[in-house]
Amino acid sequence: MRRRKPKWDAQPTQSIGVVLASDGRADFSSQTVATAVALESKSPVRGVCVLTIAKVHGFTLGIPHPGLLPTKAEALERTNWVERAIETIKKSGIAADGQVATTRHAVKMIAQVAQQRNASYVVVDGTKAKGIRRMIEGDIGSELKRRLRKTHIEVVIVPQ
């Protein structure tokens, strides 16, 4: 029986100090990257993981529907965001790696990666939306704080 080669890279698993995360709606701000670099020196473990989400918009019968998956252009855009953030972090002399995760539940995935990699901090941009739009789209920072409140991981929200 032939084994098929996976079409994706294996998820990094080594411990890191900081997870720089985005829910995939916007690129990382320079303030957020600078905050992640500053917090890395406070962490007992060195390194920064850059993580962004390519959102799956729905399922049919428990299977991702091809028309609701992120397009190649969206995935490439998210990859470029991650690469630019990694370049900026590496210019500061800090080890960094990154990944683009495809999921329906961005907050759950970010929390899972932070816990698996034993991070001390998760740094996210604050939500720009106000009022009803914020209620509908959600606030990644407050949702992450709620999800990670019983862990040792501190969520840092950088205001926009």
What do these predicted regions represent?
Residues M1-T32, S142-Q160:
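Intrinsically disordered or low-complexity boundary/linker segments at protein termini
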Residues M1-W8, K90-V122, Q160:
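Structural beta-alpha unit
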Residues A10-G67:
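Small/aliphatic-rich secondary-structure junction motif
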Residues Q31-T35, W81-R84, M109:
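Well-ordered alpha-helical segments embedded in enzymatic catalytic cores
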Residues C49-L51, D97-A101, E154-V158:
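General small-molecule cofactor/ligand-binding pocket signal
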Residues G67-N80:
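A short acidic, glycine-rich active-site loop
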Residues V82-G98, L148-H152:
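A structural motif corresponding to the C-terminal end of an alpha-helix
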Residues V124-R147:
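Glycine-rich, Arg-bearing micro-motifs that act as flexible, cationic patches
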